[in-house]
């Protein structure tokens, strides 16, 4: 036997994996179940025995329209660190990707994604909610991250956003004074414009500002 001076090889028995979830319009963070478990969960749903933490829905669009799919559902990430944030083009849509990890040994990265730019050329509600809190986020500190949806009693419109706690403190938007109930900071407002004889709102200045802040934050995370 060769004397290698203590140098040896230990096989790696565990492999870090990545878990992908998507924030849906109903505020749930959803992970599609693999084919092996999907049939079992769909059958349980049909028998009225669906386990907590799962749901079954029927696809309404695309080539698989009408097909039932099983999904794991979540609404919170606890004691995690945001380690990366970036955007990507997917199926003709610009999306925001947030990568979380609880920083424990062999813990998987959690990729949370949602629409970044919507059909109105403005920033999606969940992405906008995060971006407006960026100035108050402490990079390298753990956080609790959750998603929500509510209906505005005055307008009847749905509002969506995220809630972040760091060091037991709820992070607020950096662009609103919640005591004086007024806007603050240099974030621009949407402009009312006339198109084809109709008045509408142009969110371009807001979107450009928020995208700039998101890109700065993305670089800051990479440099940390």
Ranges and model annotations:
Residues 119-129:
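Short, structured beta-strand/loop micro-motifs enriched in basic residues and often containing a Trp
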Residues 1-115, 128-135, 150-197, 203-223:
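OB-fold ssDNA-binding interfaces and closely related basic DNA-contact patches used
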């Amino acid at each position: 036997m060769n004397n290698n001076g203590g140098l040896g090889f230990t096989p790696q028995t565990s492999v870090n994996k990545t878990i992908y979830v998507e924030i849906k319009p109903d505020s749930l963070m959803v992970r599609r179940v693999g084919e092996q478990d999907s049939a079992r969960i769909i059958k349980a749903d049909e028998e009225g025995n669906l386990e907590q933490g799962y749901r079954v829905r029927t696809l309404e669009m695309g080539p698989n329209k009408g097909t039932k799919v099983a999904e794991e559902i979540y609404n919170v990430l606890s004691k995690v660190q945001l380690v990366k944030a970036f955007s990507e083009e997917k199926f003709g849509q610009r999306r925001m990707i947030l990568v979380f990890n609880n920083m424990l040994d062999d813990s998987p990265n959690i990729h949370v994604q949602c629409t970044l730019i919507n059909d109105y050329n403005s920033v999606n509600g969940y992405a906008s909610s995060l971006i407006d809190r960026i100035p108050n986020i402490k990079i390298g500190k753990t956080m609790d991250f959750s998603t929500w949806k509510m209906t505005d009693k005055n307008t009847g419109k749905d509002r969506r956003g995220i809630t972040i706690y760091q060091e037991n403190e709820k992070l607020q938007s950096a662009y609103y004074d919640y005591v004086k109930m007024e806007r603050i900071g240099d974030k621009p407002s949407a402009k009312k414009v006339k198109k084809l004889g109709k008045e509408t709102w142009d969110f371009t200045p807001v979107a450009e500002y928020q995208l700039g802040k998101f890109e700065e934050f993305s670089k800051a995370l990479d440099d940390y």
